[in-house]
C-alpha cells in the first residue's frame, strides 16, 4: 500500500472489502486489524458496517488494541513510506549479496528467491539442506525465521529492523555458504506429485458435515481411505493437504509424512 507500486493492495486490485492485520509487520498489539471498504463494496454506510460488526463484537473491546491502532495511524502518516522504501532497498541488496555468494560456490540455483518486498525466501536445497535444517543453523546464530518447511525458509522484515539485523542475517547465511563442500544436487520437482494428489482426492461430504461429525484421531499412515474431519496445517493460513470431507488417499498420506503431519482427525465410522 505504501510503496511506489502500491497498486498491489487488494482494494487497489478491485476487492470490495478486505481486512489488514496490523500486528505482523506494524507496531500494533496482537489482534489489531483494519477493515477496508472498496469503492465497489455493496455497503458504503459506515454506521451499517459498524452495526454488522457489532453482531459478533464484544461489548468490552480491548482499548489497548484500539489505542495501538490509533498510534500506528500516526506512525504511518509520519514518513513511513520512505522508511518502508529504505527497508525494501536493504532487502534487495541482501538478496543480491546472498545470490552472488551462492553463485561463487557453484550452487545449482539462486539462494534468495523473488518474493514479497518485505520477505526473504531462501531455497535451502541449493545449500544441500532442508528448510528446517537451515532454520536450526540460523537459530544457533540467534536468528528466528517466520516459517520453514522441507525445502524453503521465510524471514520477515519491517522498517523497524535496525541495520545490524540485515548484517547479522547476511553474515550467518554467508558463513553457511562458505562451509559448502562439493556439488549440491537439487531434489526433483514435485509438480507432478501435486497433480497426482489433486486428481485422486474425492469429496464424500460437505465441509460443514465433516467438521461437525463425530471424530477420532488416527496416525496419518493409518488414515488412508478415511474421510478427513478437520484439516491439519503446519502454519495457518496455509493450504491443507486434504480438505474436510475429502477421502484421504495414499498420495495425501505421503505428503503428510513429508510435512511431518503425524496424526489426522477423521470422521468416526459407525460401530
Predicted regions: what they are:
Residues 257, 263, 268-271:
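Terminal helix/beta-alpha structural elements that buttress the NAD(P)+-binding lobe
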Residues 24-25, 40-42, 61, 71-72, ...:
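Short, glycine-/Ser/Thr-/acidic-enriched flexible segments
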Residues 99, 103-251, 255-259:
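Conserved C-terminal alpha-helix-loop-beta "cap" of PLP-dependent enzymes
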Residues 18-21, 28, 147, 250, ...:
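General beta-strand structural signal in soluble alpha/beta enzymes
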Residues 1-108:
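Conserved PLP-enzyme active-site core in the AAT-like
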Residues 6, 30, 60, 236-237, ...:
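Solvent-exposed, flexible loop/coil residues
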Residues 13-15, 30-31, 141-142, 237, ...:
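Short coil/turn connectors at secondary-structure junctions
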Amino acid at each position: 500500500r505504501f510503496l511506489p507500486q502500491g497498486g498491489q493492495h487488494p482494494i487497489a486490485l478491485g476487492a470490495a472489502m478486505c481486512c489488514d492485520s496490523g500486528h505482523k509487520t506494524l507496531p500494533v498489539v496482537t489482534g489489531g486489524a483494519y477493515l477496508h471498504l472498496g469503492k465497489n463494496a455493496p455497503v458504503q454506510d459506515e454506521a451499517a458496517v459498524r452495526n454488522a460488526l457489532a453482531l459478533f463484537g464484544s461489548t468490552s473491546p480491548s482499548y489497548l488494541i484500539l489505542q495501538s491502532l490509533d498510534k500506528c495511524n500516526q506512525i504511518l502518516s509520519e514518513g513511513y513510506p520512505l522508511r518502508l522504501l529504505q527497508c525494501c532497498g536493504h532487502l534487495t541488496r541482501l538478496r543480491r549479496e546472498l545470490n552472488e555468494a551462492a553463485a561463487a560456490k557453484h550452487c545449482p540455483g539462486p539462494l534468495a528467491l523473488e518474493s514479497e518486498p518485505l520477505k526473504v525466501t531462501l531455497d535451502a536445497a541449493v545449500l544441500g539442506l532442508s528448510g528446517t535444517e537451515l532454520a536450526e543453523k540460523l537459530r544457533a546464530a540467534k536468528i528466528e525465521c517466520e516459517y520453514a518447511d522441507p525445502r524453503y525458509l521465510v524471514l520477515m522484515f519491517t522498517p523497524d529492523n535496525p541495520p545490524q539485523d540485515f548484517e547479522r542475517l547476511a553474515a550467518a547465511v554467508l558463513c553457511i555458504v562458505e562451509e559448502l563442500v562439493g556439488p549440491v544436487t537439487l531434489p526433483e520437482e514435485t509438480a507432478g506429485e501435486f497433480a497426482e494428489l489433486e486428481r485422486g482426492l474425492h469429496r464424500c461430504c460437505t465441509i460443514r458435515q465433516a467438521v461437525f461429525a463425530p471424530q477420532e484421531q488416527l496416525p496419518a499412515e493409518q488414515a488412508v481411505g478415511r474421510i478427513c474431519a478437520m484439516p491439519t496445517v503446519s502454519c495457518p493460513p496455509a493450504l491443507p493437504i486434504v480438505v474436510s470431507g475429502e477421502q484421504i488417499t495414499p498420495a495425501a498420506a505421503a505428503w503428510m509424512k513429508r510435512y511431518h503431519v503425524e496424526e489426522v482427525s477423521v470422521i468416526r465410522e459407525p460401530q
